[in-house]
Swiss-Prot record:
Belongs to the CoaE family. Its EC number is 2.7.1.24. This is Dephospho-CoA kinase. The lineage of its organism: Bacteria, Pseudomonadati, Pseudomonadota, Gammaproteobacteria, Pseudomonadales. Pathway: Cofactor biosynthesis; coenzyme A biosynthesis; CoA from (R)-pantothenate: step 5/5. It is an enzyme of class 2 (transferase). The gene is coaE.
Length: 207
């Protein structure tokens, strides 16, 4: 089957917690690039009225719903971390729906290329939707320091998140481009701008 000509050229953008991938994504947005965040898509598919939320409530019971009918993420997170089989059930339900939601929003792109930002780009298989992978990397201690400064969380929780994500080595081995974000924001912006011009060339836009 031929690929539709209007399908956008897609860059996958990923990085571990505290790496700076959100700051990089925001600068691509500032440069006029259409960005779809997989975390947002994951929230959209479980909004009230969507079929996935009804299936989750039916499977786990009413305790995973808040009084206003929205998903109680903390309650659900506790259930799936305690029972791995339940996590697998949830992933089997949500991953295809999230991929569908992402594809829909990527197809709306009017910019020369589009970006899929996902912390689990590699682990979830979402990289298959992209033509190229950019990894924002940072030394682990810097990841921890940034996350502790940004979030109301403990170092133990940050370490748990790091363990759940792909290792730095695995992410980098899958990357086409890597930015080691261990300097200031101005430097990160300059790297994003350099890559932006490169991606314009690759995608057939103006450089």
């Amino acid at each position: 089957m031929n690929t539709p000509v209007e399908k956008p050229w897609i860059l996958g953008l990923t990085g571990g917690i505290g790496s700076g991938k959100s700051a990089a994504a925001q600068h691509f947005i500032d440069l006029g690039i259409h960005v779809v965040d997989a975390d947002h898509a994951a929230r959209w598919v479980v909004e009230p009225g969507r079929p996935a939320l009804a299936k989750i409530a039916e499977h786990f019971g009413p305790d995973v719903l808040q009084a206003d009918g929205t998903l109680d993420r903390a309650a659900l997170r506790k259930l799936i971390f305690e029972v791995p089989e339940q996590r697998r059930w949830l992933e089997a339900l949500l991953h295809p729906l999230i991929a569908e939601e992402i594809a829909h929003h990527l197809a709306l792109a009017k910019s020369p290329y589009a970006i899929l930002v996902s912390p689990l780009l590699i682990e979830s298989g979402q990289y298959a939707m992209t033509q190229r992978i950019l990894v924002i990397d940072a030394p682990q201690q810097l990841q921890i320091e940034r996350t502790l400064q940004r979030d109301q969380t403990s170092e133990q929780q940050v370490q748990a998140i790091l363990k759940a994500q792909s290792s730095r080595e695995d992410r980098i081995s899958r990357a086409d481009d890597v930015v080691v974000n261990d300097r200031d924001l101005a430097w990160l912006h300059s790297e994003v701008e350099r890559l932006h011009h490169f991606y314009l060339t690759l995608s057939g836009g103006q450089s």
